Amino acid sequence: MSRTVTNALGEPLSYGGSSTAWFSASGSGPLLYGTAGNDSMWADSSVDVTMIGDSGDDIYYLYSGVNRASEAPSAGVDTINTWMSYSLPENFENLTVTGVEGFGFGNSASNIISGGSGSQTINGGAGNDVLTGAGGADTFAFKRGNGSDLISDFGSDDVVRLEGYGFTSFDHILANVAQEGLDLKLSLADGEYLVFANTSADQLHANQFSLALDRSVLTQTFSDDFNTLQLSDGTSGVWDPKYWWAPEKGATLTGNDELQWYVNPTYQPTASANPFSVTDGVLTITAKPASQAIQAETNGYDYTSGMLTTYSSFAQTYGYFEMRADMPDDQGAWPAFWLLPGDGTWPPELDVVEMHGQDPNTVIATVHSNETGSQTSIASAARVTDTSGFHKYGVLWTEEEIVWYFDDAAIARADTPSDMHDPMYMLVNLAIGGMAGPPTDGLMGGAEMKVDYVKAYSLDADWHI
């Protein structure tokens, strides 16, 4: 009989039975089949293979992106074990991810999701899941509408990230917990709840919870919904289509190993490569291969793209800054929303969001500073289940602390550096290459960053983070 664990609803979830047959993909062909019994199927990192079980309780060990597992519906209790970040496919019940700083995401069923000895981000997805960190400082992420989950080993250095539930303070959390035997039950919304196994309320503390943005303390100071693109002409307009230090034909950031030239659409020799378009209230920034006709004007760069700044129109000290955007998922695309000092110095720099197109589950949040006398950076790579379509990317900058948000849920935080207390302006851009690496296909289909809006807010004078 297989071992089970009880989920938040009191339902038993199975770990699967013990294996009775073992298979290795080393030396196999592209397909490796199991038996009708309980199989252990071991991939090989150098073998491009799909392993296919049968009706038993199967466990698959995956070591690289060319290793795959496939199961039919209702064909036993099946588990994937991997060091890689992994999203559980349908028809699988359980997942173990052991890689440090990786993620393990469940599917629509009720899953058992486990981490390893290091830090992981664990999200059961839909269903009523059982989540185990298994050591390290883990992040357990939950989204409204995805069911009721149980954390089996919530530790003092673990964090719960709550998205869509409206909790804005630790006091709000404590007001919604109740002890039920050895377990602590947090009522969420719509009949959903989160159970902390073998935990009492006095074991919780505020820094274990990444909560929602409290918008009641914000006053809007800037908004562009992109019904049109208001380019600056020196006397009016909102957006500068080039860095303040760049010549009229535009520029790029050579120190970042970027592969694109930021085109200024008001510069006639490159106007044919205008990277900006507006449709139905959405600004699209397009990166694409540079035509030979303009490469003399773009210093021979292989790609063209666009960037916008509010250097000449808007800067602010502290507040909340937000962009709602649909990010590209193309290899080598490097979209960003960020802040720079209004006096033209660098550092500091505050990156609200950066992404690499080929890694859509990672939201990068960074603060750069010179407070130690040399340039330093504090970066966080927040793991999220889905960035397809439009999402909100924001940062709350206060005198004491910086907090980054994804869809109104806090995902990272850092102390405000001593040299970040002066007005900063906003930038939106789509780079190619650099940290994201080169495109694998020459970007023949182009890459698009779509921006629904950019907004900024000041903070109420008597509010503290």
Curated annotation (Swiss-Prot):
Gene3D superfamilies: 2.60.120.200, Serralysin-like metalloprotease, C-terminal
Chief location of this protein within or outside the cell: secreted
Organism superkingdom: Bacteria
Known pathway: Glycan metabolism; exopolysaccharide biosynthesis
EC number assigned by the record: 3.2.1.-
Catalytic-site annotation from UniProt: 349, 354
Any GO BP: polysaccharide biosynthetic process
Alphabetized Pfam families for the sequence: Glyco_hydro_16 (PF00722), HemolysinCabind (PF00353)
Keyword Hydrolase applies: yes
Residue span, GH16 domain: 213-462
Keywords: Exopolysaccharide synthesis, Glycosidase, Hydrolase, Plasmid, Repeat, Secreted
Hemolysin-type calcium-binding repeats: 33-50, 105-122, 123-140
CC per GO annotation: extracellular region
GO molecular function term, any single one: hydrolase activity, hydrolyzing O-glycosyl compounds
Compartments reported by the entry: Secreted
PANTHER family from the UniProt entry: GLYCOSIDE HYDROLASE FAMILY 16 PROTEIN, GLYCOSYL HYDROLASE-RELATED
Job description of the protein: Cleaves high molecular weight succinoglycan to yield LMW succinoglycan. Dynamically regulates the molecular weight distribution of succinoglycan by cleaving nascent succinoglycan only during a limited period after its synthesis, perhaps before it undergoes a time-dependent change in its conformation or aggregation state.
Family classification: Belongs to the glycosyl hydrolase 16 family.
Name by which UniProt lists this protein: Endo-1,3-1,4-beta-glycanase EglC
